[in-house]
Amino acid sequence: MAGGAREVLTLQLGHFAGFVGAHWWNQQDAALGRATDAKESPGELCPDVLYRTGRTLHGQDTYTPRLILMDLKGSLSSLKEEGGLYRDKQLDAAIAWQGKLTTHKEELCPKNPYLQDFLSAEGVLSSDGVWRVKSIPNGKGSPPLTTATTPKPLIPTEASIRVWSDFLRVHLHPRSICMIQKYNHDGEAGRLEAFGQGESVLKEPKYQEELEDRLHFYVEECDYLQGFQILCDLHDGFSGVGAKAAELLQDEYSGRGIITWGLLPGPYHRGEAQRNIYRLLNTAFGLVHLAAHSSLVCPLSLGGSLGLRPEPPVNFPYLHYDATLPFHCSAILATALDTVTVPYRLCSSPVSMVHLADMLSFCGKKVVTAGATIPFPLAPGQSLPDSLMQFGGATPWTPLSACGEPSGTRCFAQSVVLRGIDRACHTSQLTPGTPPPSSLHACTTGEEVLAQYLQQQQPRVMSSSHLLLTPYRVAPPYPHLFSSCSPQGMVLDGSPKGAAVESIPVFGALCSSSSLHQTLEALARDLTKLDLRRWASFMDAGVEHDDVAELLQELQSLAQCYHAGDSLVD
């Protein structure tokens, strides 16, 4: 591992986590492809934090995500469980048995046309069955193969996206994908629906040993492992898988950071009674158990509520999305996730996962909220102070943790990242002798502007801030969500003309907020209203009545940590 990177191992648990993860890894891949571009700011984010180098049996250098993902039978579509990068037909044919063989061949899923286009651009399958990669970004691996013309890439349509692998542009290591064969992705029967089912999966020796083997494979090759990030579905049985996985990590790798992102797709409807009750129970059990075994937990959702009462999805002024499409929702959440995780992925002066968690989780506040402004509204000719002053005293970001509007709530500690603003716009370019319209316009660096803005907004709050030149890439397969934006994500008057949006500035934050007091108490109130006798199927999956009583008590204790009077300063 070059450069002493502080490695992170990612766990993706669940199908919606797969959607968010696919956008996340596509973003990392897009950043790698731009690393040698003379126009780009070099070296702000270290890809080795998330990626590992390797080599196939045929001597091909590889650069793949340091990733373990778990999903259900039937969820991969045309993606093979072992991936496509290391495949070797000669090895597949090496069978020890010399007797008579009967072959049962399963019909292959048709590959998404978008991925066919991607694979033809990335490499070729030779006649001997070996995948030959054309190039590996960022100088990793052999020189690129060139062609006379570069075909324009296909853009996936919403109708063509059924599962997350339909738009994943990144090759995975054979040790990345772990399928839970006892439960089905499709159909009404054999579903992983309840927290107890998920916990029991990792209590089975087969799955527990498989996860441990993969963990040891990745961890043992790390020089400076800083920790683990878990992307975990909260709404279904994967909340139990995530809780058990976090417990295993805490037991085996004490002292390492464990940051868990609890993911919830949206929206939901009153008419789906059983699904809504299960979602409530899974979310409550997941949050409490994940908080017990993680350094930090952050729910991520575009919904307005974690409880039983449906609330409309959140709104972004310059972004139009369909809340019923996981492809859209996951893209937005991945944008926020890639931004708020910047501190522990920096090349220079990174903040470790443990330090970030310690700063935000004092006094037992291990659950935090997320928010983001996507895109950050900078118009042509404006400076950063101009744009920040437009927010006035309002919270600048849209809430992404289903905890309601942050207005009127109290922030105890926050980590803020602003990315993608050109250096020339960081400070106000006033004509000499012109009095500055605000104290922000008098600042001499962008970092000073951001720090002073946060101090003015939350004068008694512990704040950490980072300002990056690196924007967020929104090239295909990222969906077309932006209106009235230039190719670089600047806000324009009227309809945009010309090229599509390629990158955007993003303002993201993690916050320990008093809004969690109301949210967690509301969860507990909704649980007390349930007649558990009506939901025996959830209880039969491995949850006792005493477990629910204990859950209520722990939810209320956790909620009390966020009472507005509990702060570092008064």
What are the roles of these predicted feature ranges?
Residues A2-D570:
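Terminal, contiguous helix-loop blocks that mediate binding/assembly
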